[in-house]
Amino acid sequence: MIESPNRHQHSIAGAYGPFQLMPDVARKFGLHVSAHRDDRTNISLAAEACAKLLKQIAIPNSIKILESHGYRITQEIQEALWFKLFVLHVYHAGAFNVSQAMETACPEEPGMNLIFKLWQTRAGKFQNASQNYSQLAIAAWYELDRHITYIP
């Protein structure tokens, strides 16, 4: 999900570009980051790096976090909306911060109730922006669907 659509902004943590990629993450996925050139501002290259980050880091870490809480993550679960929202939380806040939030929230079962608990949980660096991230994704999906299915 594009986090900084209007202009290229640096986060306090050092993330940059439309997908707010950290320098080390960008480099890991093949982007050039230096004082003279920063591929994080190239929407195509940054989108590809973001997709790799989701596939290679966010999804596997999401599965590890959930399995560490006793949840069995099947292919069917990975296709569920709540799991995709959980992955977005890991993408945005990082696996460590989501793990801390899970320890604090102590959700009893996987599903949308787990996501609702995360929306109300603060732990470590999992704060307001992290809580709201999947809500923004839902709003974006809703708007996209509304425009795709629009009939004048």
Q: Predicted regions span which residues?
A:
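Catalytic glycan-binding domains that act on GlcNAc-containing polysaccharides
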Residues: 1-152
